[in-house]
Amino acid sequence: MERYESLFAQLKERKEGAFVPFVTLGDPGIEQSLKIIDTLIEAGADALELGIPFSDPLADGPTIQNATLRAFAAGVTPAQCFEMLALIRQKHPTIPIGLLMYANLVFNKGIDEFYAQCEKVGVDSVLVADVPVEESAPFRQAALRHNVAPIFICPPNADDDLLRQIASYGRGYTYLLSRAGVTGAENRAALPLNHLVAKLKEYNAAPPLQGFGISAPDQVKAAIDAGAAGAISGSAIVKIIEQHINEPEKMLAALKVFVQPMKAATSS
């Protein structure tokens, strides 16, 4: 959890926002997935948002569903994902690592056991995509017991009550939704969310990172101009993996070319 705090403090000092890529662990196979993550960090990623392959991903658009299918095809299991997380943490001791998951994967292990395992491998935050704030008590309590930040999604139409709850229960960062619907780079992020950002600040919420539909540097800049602490980009990155599925070296080079200008756009 503390890794987010020190990251945001360092970025503030450097007058930068955070650029956070999302990928699915084990896509397209364990070895290449670890290389992808190293490449994203080398290219300037400030934190990582990682998915564990799950058979029924509700909030994911087709691009990320395909990533899950590729990981399944490679035989990747949740247990192997945790082994990967331990390796990533060993190699990169300071970068914040977040998981984006679904409740079933947490239930399968037992809620407390799941967060204990997160703590053990060095995961900093967990966002359970299909658990709304009002049903989150057992998850967020277990998370805090194990020094893992519970992350909440703030939708564009959030009312005051929801904003207060998110501010009060969330830690690490707040996942600011650019728009309603499923993830995807095709649907570019719409309106700047200054009003939500202002409200979240007023209620002392964890720093907001804008996600969903972030696929170009100008959108990263717009998110930061609207007051967000940074931006999360998933589908656009996973699409690059898909496009170069049979050319592992080209894939890594293309990821670098994509991430560098996205990170550069976070500087004011």
Swiss-Prot record:
Catalytic residues of the enzyme: E49 (proton acceptor), D60 (proton acceptor)
Pathway given in the UniProt record: Amino-acid biosynthesis; L-tryptophan biosynthesis; L-tryptophan from chorismate: step 5/5
InterPro entries per the UniProt record, alphabetical: Aldolase_TIM, RibuloseP-bd_barrel, Trp_synthase_alpha_AS, Trp_synthase_suA
Gene3D superfamilies: Aldolase class I
Enzyme class label: lyase
Its EC number(s): 4.2.1.20
CDD domains listed in its UniProt record: Tryptophan_synthase_alpha (cd04724)
Entry's Gene Ontology molecular function annotations: tryptophan synthase activity
Keyword Cytoplasm in record: no
Domain of life: Bacteria
Assigned GO CC terms: cytosol
Reactions listed under catalytic activity: (1S,2R)-1-C-(indol-3-yl)glycerol 3-phosphate + L-serine = D-glyceraldehyde 3-phosphate + L-tryptophan + H2O
Keyword field contains Hydrolase: no
Entry keywords, A to Z: Amino-acid biosynthesis, Aromatic amino acid biosynthesis, Lyase, Tryptophan biosynthesis
Pfam families xrefs: Trp_syntA
Biological role stated in the UniProt entry: The alpha subunit is responsible for the aldol cleavage of indoleglycerol phosphate to indole and glyceraldehyde 3-phosphate.
Subunit structure of this chain's protein: Tetramer of two alpha and two beta chains.
Family: Belongs to the TrpA family.
UniProt-listed NCBIfam families: trpA (TIGR00262)
Protein's recorded name: Tryptophan synthase alpha chain
Originating organism: Shigella boydii serotype 18 (strain CDC 3083-94 / BS512)
